[in-house]
Regions:
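N-terminal beta1-alpha1 ligand-phosphate binding loop
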Residues: 2-38
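Donor/substrate-binding cores of folate-linked one-carbon enzymes
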Residues: 21, 83-182
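Short, surface-exposed acidic-centric catalytic microdomains
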Residues: 23-64
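Conserved acidic residues
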Residues: 25, 75, 96
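N-terminal glycine-rich "phosphate-gripper" loop used for MgATP/nucleotide binding
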Residues: 29-30, 58, 72-88
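Hydrophobic beta-strand scaffold residues
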Residues: 47-48, 76, 98, 125
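Short, well-structured alpha-helical segments in soluble
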Residues: 63-72
């Protein structure tokens, strides 16, 4: 059975969708006060949290992550709102085993504000992308994408909600395609 870990920095809504359908070995957050940790507790999922500032440098921070991943024999790391750029230490240890979800149709609107950037650009549609993580920012090879239209009477809140709904469908589809067993 493939073991997965989820990395998230904040709310953890994508983590919750994943954890309700798939066995998650653990969730990691780079913020000790992130709501994702409460979600994990409620779902009975093991959680870890530590912050970059607790380490001498990013290489040491990522070495601690690699140690966790190896200790739990993780096969696939699912980034779900993890707002740190994966650096060379983690990438070298887990290249080809880290995926990310991005709330835009890449290569359009990479970076931390995909939904807002798409909205402000006035595009007719944006979407959701799951891709392999590489050394760039949202530049890895696309695994799967889905388009989300911007409706005539949309507010940014409605548009964002539809993008999140698309995310909640796409991550399980990708995990199924990788042969991750469901609960």
């Amino acid at each position: 059975m493939k073991k997965i870990a989820v990395f998230a920095s904040g709310n953890g809504s994508n983590f919750q969708v994943i954890a309700e359908e798939f066995p998650v070995e653990f969730v990691f957050s780079d913020h000790r006060d992130a709501y994702v940790l409460e979600r994990a507790d409620k779902l009975g999922v093991l959680s870890y949290a530590f912050e970059l500032k607790e380490f001498e440098n990013k290489a040491d921070y990522e070495a601690a992550l690699v140690e966790l991943l190896e200790e739990h024999q993780i096969d696939l790391v699912c980034l779900a709102g993890y707002m740190k750029i994966v650096g060379p230490t983690l990438l070298a240890a887990y290249e080809g085993r880290i995926i990310n979800i991005h709330p835009a149709y890449l290569p359009e609107f990479p970076g931390a504000h995909g939904i807002e950037d798409a909205w402000n650009a006035g595009v007719a549609e944006s979407g959701v992308t799951i891709h392999w993580v590489d050394s760039g920012v949202d530049t890895g090879k696309v695994i799967k994408q889905v388009r989300v239209p911007r409706l005539a009477d949309d507010t940014i809140e409605n548009f964002e909600a539809r993008i999140h709904e698309a995310e909640y469908k796409l991550y399980p589809e990708v995990l199924d395609s990788f042969g991750v067993e469901r609960k």
